[in-house]
Amino acid sequence: LWPSSAASDVYKRQDVFSSLDYESHVHGQKSYNGVAIISKKKLDNVKTDIIKDKLKQSRIISAEVEHKKKKIQLINIYTPNGNPVDTPKYEYKKNWLDDLIKKLKSLSKTNKNIILAGDFNVIPAAEDVYNPKSFEDDALYRLEIRKKFREMLGLGFSDVYRHFNETKEGYTFWDYMRGAWQKNNGMRID
């Protein structure tokens, strides 16, 4: 989805390293991570530190936009992958998600107009991966990570894809190194 080919008012991207010709706010790094919010509408209160990231990785950006005289808080995230499990990477993912949930709880007390989007790096349910059994001990699908995702939904957020596609598979990622696209061995993590 690119501004030159669609008429959307707001764009959110992950793995972003430079800005486009809209009002854009980018929080990126040289070689990986990075998030942005790109909008036709004026963005206010842009922040990249709404949760404290001990590793200072570029994983979150938030902004407010006015729509129909209402302030909407936009939050774009790039959740840590967390693999391999039983390493500091997995602990970082769990702590990052805990911090995000804590912040979302706080924000949702005063603002009911929040749009949370991005790369969650979570496979929410069995129908969201081609072979759930093979991912049981993967950081994308471990039960404790899926519980954290459901905890976010419990704050009043909706899984928009599942809302419109209750049982339909719809993958967002295929491993490019193993011919996964051709075999449709995908997963929904975004």
Where are these regions (language model features)?
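Surface-exposed cleft-lining segments at the edges of enzyme active sites
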Residues: 51, 79-97, 133-138
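Metal-dependent phosphoesterases centered on the DNase I-like endonuclease/exonuclease/phosphatase
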Residues: 16-23, 96-189
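Single conserved hydrophobic/aromatic residue that forms the stacking wall/gate
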Residues: 1-7, 11
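Short, surface-exposed beta-edge/turn micro-motifs
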Residues: 34, 189-190
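Structured beta-strand-rich core segments of catalytic domains in phosphoester-bond hydrolases
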Residues: 9-84
